[in-house]
Every structure is written in structure tokens, then in C-alpha cells.
Swiss-Prot record:
Disruption phenotype: No visible phenotype. Plants lacking ENODL11, ENODL12, ENODL13, ENODL14 and ENODL15 have a reduced seed set due to aborted ovules as a result of pollen tubes failling to rupture and release their sperm cell cargo.
UniProt cross-references to PANTHER family, sorted A to Z: BLUE COPPER PROTEIN (PTHR33021), EARLY NODULIN-LIKE PROTEIN 12 (PTHR33021:SF540)
Tissue specificity statement from the Swiss-Prot or TrEMBL entry: Confined to flowers and siliques. Expressed in female gametophytes.
Subcellular localization, as worded in the UniProt entry: Cell membrane
Propeptide: 168-190
Protein name according to UniProt: Early nodulin-like protein 12
């Protein structure tokens, strides 16, 4: 009987770890692929279409891969984003492999530092979701992927899809398996 409490405690801790696994920070490549940070091929194929179809969470990292000889990434205010003003960036990155921590909820505005590229559409707005403090709802642990072009420029991000439900189901099955194992071991030791 003395071993049941430590075993059940271990099972509880493992269950807590599995159920919180979806909240781990992700490293997300801008546009979903190398070479996406460029002037878009068409007005219907912008990085904002990609961003609108993905969810970003506090703690995630966003990564740009680009040729540092011809481009850079500028984090700017909303006003500078809308006017493509490169003169006063909040932050400037020009290393060709830029990694930015999304450390607060709300919008982030990024534009190209290459002359004229922002006006041609090389810019992106990322909206980072607020952290949920209570146990309500679940979050998707899936990394964003390239999505089909959105028919309108201002569509909301989609709800988590079947993959999120699948991840939750797998986590529940793993936790249930650990719990049953602990019960069997506990009964065998009694």
C-alpha cells in the first residue's frame, strides 16, 4: 500500500506533462518555407495570407531566412508598416537568419528593409494570441504550414483543425495508459 501514493503521484505528474505538451514554444519559418521572405509573385499570394491562416502563441519564435546581401527584416509600428517607412524601425535584423521571440500577445509588424520591397508587398503582420490562464479550451501544438490563398484580405485565423483533436486524443490515451499501468502495479504490490 505504501508504494501506491508515490506511483499515483508520478502518474499525475506525467499526465500533467503530456497535457501541457501542446503549449511548448514552436519555431516557425515565415511563409512556411525557405525563401518566402521576398516580394510576392502576385497580390493574392502575400505573407499576410499565410499569417492569417495560422495561429501564433506567446513563446513561439518566428524565423526568416533570406539573402542578407539584398534584404533585411525591420520590426516597425503599425503606422510605419502601413506607410512602408523604413527610417525608424523598432528593431532591425540583417543576418539572413533572423529569429524573433513572440513574447507578448497582439500584433507584430514587419517590413522588408530593401528599398521599395515593402511597397511591393514584402511585409507581414503577425497576430499573437493571448495566453489562456484557465483550463478552458485547448490549443493546437501543430506548427503552421502553408495554407491555400484566402479569398479576402481580412479573414480571421481558422479554428484548430482535426490535428489538434488528434493530438489531444493521443495525449489522453497516453495518460490513460500510464494511469492504468500505475493501478495494476499498485494492486500487484498490495
Amino acid at each position: 500500500m505504501g508504494i501506491i501514493v508515490p506511483v499515483l503521484t508520478l502518474v499525475f505528474l506525467l499526465f500533467a506533462k503530456v497535457s501541457h505538451g501542446a503549449s511548448n514554444p514552436r519555431v516557425i519559418l515565415v511563409g512556411g518555407s525557405v525563401g518566402s521572405w521576398k516580394v510576392p509573385d502576385s497580390p493574392n499570394n502575400t505573407l499576410n495570407h499565410w499569417a492569417e491562416n495560422n495561429r501564433f502563441k506567446v513563446g513561439d519564435f518566428i524565423v526568416w531566412k533570406y539573402d542578407m546581401k539584398v534584404d533585411s527584416v525591420l520590426q516597425v509600428t503599425k503606422e510605419d508598416y502601413e506607410s512602408c517607412n523604413t527610417a525608424n524601425p523598432l528593431k532591425q535584423y540583417n543576418d539572413g537568419n533572423t529569429k524573433v521571440a513572440l513574447d507578448k500577445s497582439g500584433p507584430y509588424f514587419f517590413i522588408s528593409g530593401a528599398p521599395g520591397n515593402c511597397a511591393k508587398g514584402e511585409k507581414i503582420t503577425l497576430v499573437v494570441l493571448a495566453e489562456r490562464k484557465s483550463g478552458g479550451g485547448s490549443s493546437s501544438g501543430d506548427a503552421p504550414k502553408v495554407s491555400p490563398v484566402s479569398p479576402t484580405a481580412q479573414t480571421p485565423a481558422p479554428a484548430p483543425g482535426p490535428a489538434a483533436a488528434h493530438n489531444a486524443a493521443v495525449g489522453l490515451k497516453v495518460a490513460s495508459g500510464w494511469f492504468l499501468t500505475a493501478v495494476v502495479v499498485g494492486l500487484a504490490m498490495a
